[in-house]
Curated annotation (Swiss-Prot):
Binding residue positions for ATP: T30, L31, G32, P33, K51, D87, G88, T89, T90, T91, G415, D495
EC code: 5.6.1.7
SUBUNIT field: Forms a cylinder of 14 subunits composed of two heptameric rings stacked back-to-back. Interacts with the co-chaperonin GroES.
Record-linked Gene3D superfamilies: GroEL (3.50.7.10), GroEL-like equatorial domain (1.10.560.10), TCP-1-like chaperonin intermediate domain (3.30.260.10)
Protein name: Chaperonin GroEL 3
HAMAP family per record: CH60
Region forming the signal peptide: none
Amino acid sequence: MSAKAIKFNHHAREKMLKGVNILADSVKVTLGPKGRNVVIAQKYSRPIITKDGVTVAKEIELIDPFENMGAQLTKEVAFQASDSAGDGTTTATVLTQAIVNEGVNAISANMNPIDLKKGIDKCLHYALLELNLLSQNCDNLEKAEQIATISANGEEQIGKLIAQAMERIGTDGVVSVEDAQGYDDELIFKEGLAFDRGYLSPYFINNHEKSTVELNNPSILLLDDKLTHMEDLLPLLEKLANNRNPLLVIAEDINNEVLSRIIGNNMKNNLKVTVIKSPAFGSRRTEILQDLAIYTGGTVISPEIGMDLSEVDTDKLGNASKIIITDSNTTIVHGEGDPQLIMQRIKQLNSQLLNSSSEYDQKKLAERVAKLSGAIAIIKVGAATEVAMKEKKDRVEDALHATKAAIKEGIVPGGGVAYIRIAQTLASLEGDNPDQSFGIKILLKAMESPLKQIAKNAGNEPVEVLSTIKKQTGNFGFDAKNDRYGDMMEFGIIDPTKVTRCALEFAASIASLILTTEVMVADMEDNNANHANHDHAHSLNCSH
C-alpha cells in the first residue's frame, strides 16, 4: 500500500511553475559570452565549475515532488536540445520559463489553456517559416570557426581546431574529443571509416568507462545474409579458435538464439566475437558491404553468388588495427585493404556521383566517398585540473555539434537577434479568438527572453538593449562580449539555424504540456501519509 498526494488545477500549476523557475534560474545565468559560472558539489570528488547549461540541469533534483516535476520537465527541454542540436540548452530553458510564467498568469486570469496552446502552436508554425527565410548557408571555414568559438563560450583556439577538423573530414566524418597529456589543445587525424550501426547487446561492452566495444587487431566477417543458425558459424570459429584476436561479424540480421549463444561463448572462450547489423538496406546495403570489404581487405560472403558461410576460410576475412563500437556507431580504424583498390573504388563512386540525376543518390554516394577516403579527427583537450578538463570537454562537444548543425542547416544572426526579428515580423498575427491571440503573444514575448538574459548576464540593462535593437532592422544586435551594437554577421556572432529552431520547438512543446496540466500525482512521504495537505492535496491509497 502506498499513499499518493494529488494536486489539482491552479495548485498543480503553481507547484510546477516553482520547479520550472528554480531550474531555469540555475541554468540561465550561464547564457551568453559573459555567462556566469555554476559550482556543483560532488559527493566523492572536487566540485565541478561549469558554464554548460545542460550540465547544470542534470544535477538538479528538488525535494518537493510536485516542484520536482516542473524541474524535470524543464530539464527534458535541455536534454532534447542537446540531443538534437548539441547546443541551445540554456536558450531552450530560458524560452520555456518565459512561456510557462506568462501562460500560468493568463490561466489565472481565466483564459482557456487549450486555446492558449493553440495560439502558441500557431505562432510556432509561422515562426519556423520565418526562421527558414532568415537562414543563410554556412559555406566557409571562417563562419564555421565563428560558430564553434561562440558555442565554446568564446574560446578561439577551440573554434579554430573544430573548423579545421570540419574542413578536412566534412560533417559526415568522425570527430572524437579526448584528454590531452598536457595543458595544450591539439588536433590530430587518424584514418578510419565510420557508419551508423551499434552493438546489439551491452554484454559486448569491454570498455565500461566509455560504454563502448573496443576491438584491437580484429578479423571481420562480412555477411550479406541473415545469421540464423549458430552451426553455420561454428566451422569458422573453430578455425579461429587458437587466434586471440577478436572477430567482428557484420550481418543483415542476427537470430536472438544465435546472439545469446555468442554472448555465452564469449564468457567461456578466448575468442571474443561481437556482432552488429549491416549498415543501410536492400541493394544499398550490399554496396556498402562491398565498400567495407575493399577497405578491410575482406570478401563479402553472399549466398547469391554461391558462397556458404559454413565453408568460409579465414582468408575471406577483413582486418583492421582497431574497431570502436558505441550504442549507435561503428568506426573501423586502419582497414588493411589494398590502397590501390580503395582508390579505384573511390573513383568508381565519384563517377556514379557525376552521372546520377537523383539528389538522394548523390548525397548517399558522396557520404560513401567521404567515408572511404576520410579520416577521423581527434581533438585533444588540455587543462590544468581534472575538473577543468571535464568542463572544457563539455564545451568542445557542444561546439562540435553546433558547428555540424550550422554546416548542415545554415546560420542566423546570433545573440537572440533572430528571435527578435521573427517576433517583429509576426507582431500582427492573430488567433481565432482572444485567448488564442494571447497564446500567440505569449510566444512572441518569450522570444525576447534569450536576448534580455544575455544582456543581463553581461551587466547591461535588458530592457534598454532590447529597445535599441527593436528600433533597428536586419542583423543589427548587441555584442555582449565587447559591449557594442552593430551587424551580428559582421561581428561573427552567429547561431546555427538548427539550434535556434530546436530550442524554440522543444520549449513551446514542453511549456504547452505544463500549461495544459490539470492534475499532478506523487508519492506521499510516510510521515504525511495519514494527513491531507492543507493546500488541497488529497491522499489516495493504491495497492500494488
